[in-house]
């Protein structure tokens, strides 16, 4: 299976897997659910250039991040739904 290497200040995020949701005895279809805004970074670019110097990304592979509701580009890779987003669209890193 091919892998994705994001360029520049982009990262590949695997959105948090939301389990099937029920309200009473009614199953809520995927189309009616809110998109998750939390996920795990599975690949990261090298960083961005500012004034001719490479500035490395603050997030790293393995970080759990929060991102904007409409951030990034959705893709499918190996049967998984993934998101490619810019580091600037990441709102924060979840820590335990």
UniProtKB/Swiss-Prot annotation:
It comes from the Bacteria. It comes from Leptospira biflexa serovar Patoc (strain Patoc 1 / ATCC 23582 / Paris). Coiled coil: none annotated. GO terms for molecular function: ATP binding; metal ion binding; protein folding chaperone; protein-folding chaperone binding; unfolded protein binding. It is found in: Cytoplasm. The gene is groES. Disulfide bonds: none annotated. Keywords: Chaperone, Cytoplasm. HAMAP family: CH10. Belongs to the GroES chaperonin family. One of its GO terms (cellular component) is cytoplasm. One of its GO terms (biological process) is chaperone cofactor-dependent protein refolding. The keyword Manganese does not apply. Together with the chaperonin GroEL, plays an essential role in assisting protein folding. The GroEL-GroES system forms a nano-cage that allows encapsulation of the non-native substrate proteins and provides a physical environment optimized to promote and accelerate protein folding. GroES binds to the apical surface of the GroEL ring, thereby capping the opening of the GroEL channel. This is Co-chaperonin GroES.
